[in-house]
Amino acid sequence: MLLDAGPQYPAIGVTTFGASRHHSAGDVAERDVGLGINPFADGMGAFKLNPSSHELASAGQTAFTSQAPGYAAAAALGHHHHPGHVGSYSSAAFNSTRDFLFRNRGFGDAAAAASAQHSLFAASAGGFGGPHGHTDAAGHLLFPGLHEQAAGHASPNVVNGQMRLGFSGDMYPRPEQYGQVTSPRSEHYAAPQLHGYGPMNVNMAAHHGAGAFFRYMRQPIKQELICKWIEPEQLANPKKSCNKTFSTMHELVTHVTVEHVGGPEQSNHICFWEECPREGKPFKAKYKLVNHIRVHTGEKPFPCPFPGCGKVFARSENLKIHKRTHTGEKPFKCEFEGCDRRFANSSDRKKHMHVHTSDKPYLCKMCDKSYTHPSSLRKHMKVHESSSQGSQPSPAASSGYESSTPPTIVSPSTDNPTTSSLSPSSSAVHHTAGHSALSSNFNEWYV
């Protein structure tokens, strides 16, 4: 990536980066003596953020020096010299150059410009490690000589090893040849910003240990799915199941379908899964056996296609019914004349029809009461649960579904002295009147 630095400023040793200038040898020598080595003063056509590997290899023959005190200090800490690492150079005059650049690009006030010598090319302490996993990064910065005073204070223009530039999209991760990302603080910046910067030659090699992206590349949880099918010849005690293990649901289902259920030649469609509650009762068709086996394997191959729902189903019919909750479709209308109730599935309509036919197929096993809807039976069962625990039972609301059969074993009204003093005939009249009042409007009944 190339940056245009604007017009020329020969007084501080900066020429136009877009095009090179020609100077006499005397001018160049005089400027080098007075200002120190400035790699951007002459001959460098542009300011490149990350030089390629062949440019780094020839760094000793360019404006960069091969070694300097900054690199020697890093070597004393245990770093080894590699040809790909850039040495240091004198930065006394170049500091004023970068001070101007930060002022010109709008990088902040004078304090920010004064600390710019640690911001553009120096990472925050401990932010980057060397190529061998070292945490001290002084010897592996882009320009290590500028890092000698960076440990004293943090720069506002470097965020966890990121170089901040004064234009849109100004967060750029450092290239891999100057040290890999090891600090977890830099993950918030490096991971989202790395995409779309291919021309910058940013290389984040995955074989250098844990980096900024590895927390987002978690390994899938390994699971073992065991086949518990018992072959008919293995039914004799002790029963021996298949016990083959699989890592994916697809492999388990394929194994059961091919190896155990069989093809069209099988006439008996019996589930031999271990502890199956059907106990050898056959199915009338193979597809029914296949659907039943999903109860044992846990396979649910039919996901809801609506975004954000996430529900999955073992049978396509259940998915079809479920999708009506999203669409609001209710194709099943009550067939009783005068009732305009509609339902999403036929089973709910069938339960509702008991209201009109006065059928009470849902019987209480603890008393003689019966109900037209299973929800009413569930409410009634709470009365028995509370009475068995010794608490005072609350009267159960009839909701139009309670049977008018006189209570025989347990009745909520037995604890009420006023109700218990009534004769059976008056009690029956009371229930009949209640039913006639509730039957005036079918549409108000809860189903």
UniProtKB/Swiss-Prot annotation:
Alphabetical list of SMART domains matching this protein: ZnF_C2H2
Disulfide-linked positions: none
Biased composition (Low complexity): 386-427
Any one cellular-component term (Gene Ontology): nucleoplasm
GO MF term list: DNA-binding transcription activator activity, RNA polymerase II-specific; DNA-binding transcription factor activity; DNA-binding transcription factor activity, RNA polymerase II-specific; RNA polymerase II cis-regulatory region sequence-specific DNA binding; sequence-specific double-stranded DNA binding; zinc ion binding
Zinc finger region(s), C2H2-type: 225-260, 269-296, 302-326, 332-356, 362-384
Localisation: Nucleus; Cytoplasm
Keyword field: Activator, Craniosynostosis, Cytoplasm, Developmental protein, Differentiation, Disease variant, DNA-binding, Intellectual disability, Metal-binding, Neurogenesis, Nucleus, Repeat, Transcription, Transcription regulation, Zinc, Zinc-finger
An individual GO BP term: spinal cord development
Annotated tissue distribution: CNS. A high level expression is seen in the cerebellum. Detected in the nuclei of the cerebellar granule cell lineage from the progenitor cells of the external germinal layer to the postmigrated cells of the internal granular layer. Detected in medulloblastoma (26/29 cases), but not present in all other tumors examined.
Assembly with partners or alone: Interacts (via the C2H2-type domains 3, 4 and 5) with MDFIC (via the C2H2-type domains 3, 4 and 5). Interacts with GLI1; the interaction enhances transcription activation. Interacts with GLI2. Interacts with GLI3; the interaction enhances transcription activation.
Domain notes: The C2H2-type 3, 4 and 5 zinc finger domains are necessary for transcription activation.
Family named by the database record: Belongs to the GLI C2H2-type zinc-finger protein family.
Function: Acts as a transcriptional activator. Involved in neurogenesis. Plays important roles in the early stage of organogenesis of the CNS, as well as during dorsal spinal cord development and maturation of the cerebellum. Involved in the spatial distribution of mossy fiber (MF) neurons within the pontine gray nucleus (PGN). Plays a role in the regulation of MF axon pathway choice. Promotes MF migration towards ipsilaterally-located cerebellar territories. May have a role in shear flow mechanotransduction in osteocytes. Retains nuclear GLI1 and GLI3 in the cytoplasm.
Associated clinical condition: Craniosynostosis 6: A form of craniosynostosis, a primary abnormality of skull growth involving premature fusion of one or more cranial sutures. The growth velocity of the skull often cannot match that of the developing brain resulting in an abnormal head shape and, in some cases, increased intracranial pressure, which must be treated promptly to avoid permanent neurodevelopmental disability.
Listed name of the protein: Zinc finger protein ZIC 1
Origin organism lineage: Eukaryota, Metazoa, Chordata, Craniata, Vertebrata
